[in-house]
């Protein structure tokens, strides 16, 4: 493939064009009065979204060099989403502001590496200040506020997420399901999540979210290594006749057996997902017994003399739903309350009997997983388009509340970093000089960008709002809904410190990397012969089969 090489300023300006295109599309969604974006889908109805990372994933330009800029900025959003689960739009707005300011200086002759060093030092300073000002989560009211703000100022979402967290605990599992009515409901059921993901990505059923979702699956639980596919054939044939999917939890699955399962899954013969058993040694056996109690199945173990080839359908566990990602597996079960209660009592007795603090801790972890259950939020909406948007908002809200529990909360609406900016300027002028000072000031000026954008989206003058906020005490800021200045904690406008920190870290990382870029190598697009004017697709043409 023929390549195009761009150098120095041309390379940086081309990347910036991609940055501009993506930022303009994503930044309009920022804040409580942010607008929506409509995404055209090749198959199915268009999707209306308000979620930064979802929009970023969909944008692709014709120019491959500009597209490279989009991919780089998308990384800042994706990384923020992976770490904190929210704050993707803020990360994009910050990275764009740093890049615009930085490119101006580099073009004027500043040394990119020294400027980047200044950006890195400034980022460390701001992160320290964010952690200093973070307040721990006190009660469910704090959780409700965080969830409401994260869901785009939707109080109903805030209430449901806070109730879910109250019922399953701060470490509990909250799962989303598509409901069958127009109202969003909360249900707490038996269930468990463990930290083992699918052994092959070919088991994925939802490629957009990279999840394997199995509805009403049978569950094969074994502490044995599956080496020969012949061992599985009898039970696979029985399951195929039921038409239900299968989740395999095993010690390990050898290549030959795994390949057969993948091929059957891809051909649609049998929907299946396989994960490795959680825990180690004796601990693993106990966790498998917990899963068996939860799902009403048996552990197929050598200790009990059971062999895989002799397994019958009634020995398998059952669940309402199983969701498997690359990192963990969530089982939503129901109808085995008595067995689960008996198992919980057994673990409680063991906790009282053991003396080792390590064993006690592991037993308590198992108890929490079994007793906590799973909060299932059934998302309701009038149309499928609204349902998808609501699901994304709920997902953001759940992630934001978990981030808030971890690192605390800070004043929201871009206020925290806007208040830290003058402190950064003061510190930089006393500690930095020359081009390092330039790098630090780039970050200081970029810190106002999210607040400015929130105000602009609310129909106010962003520059005026920024100047007013600079004069206010740290806890006070701009309420875009009411268009007035308030105490952010009292008004319930709060952000998780982890989200703000991650957005800044990833924005600075991408911004700094682009500033130090001296060349871009991209594939030259093929200039394909265009059809003569007026010639449209004939019968059977122009469709993807």
From Swiss-Prot:
Disulfide bonds: none annotated. Residues 535-545 have a biased composition (Gly residues). Its EC number is 5.6.1.7. It is found in: Cytoplasm. Its main location: cytoplasm. Together with its co-chaperonin GroES, plays an essential role in assisting protein folding. The GroEL-GroES system forms a nano-cage that allows encapsulation of the non-native substrate proteins and provides a physical environment optimized to promote and accelerate protein folding. NCBIfam families: GroEL, PRK00013.1, PRK12849.1, PRK12850.1, PRK12851.1. PANTHER family: 60 KDA HEAT SHOCK PROTEIN, MITOCHONDRIAL. Belongs to the chaperonin (HSP60) family. This is Chaperonin GroEL 3. It comes from Trichormus variabilis (strain ATCC 29413 / PCC 7937) (Anabaena variabilis). The lineage of its organism: Bacteria, Bacillati, Cyanobacteriota, Cyanophyceae, Nostocales. The gene is groEL3.
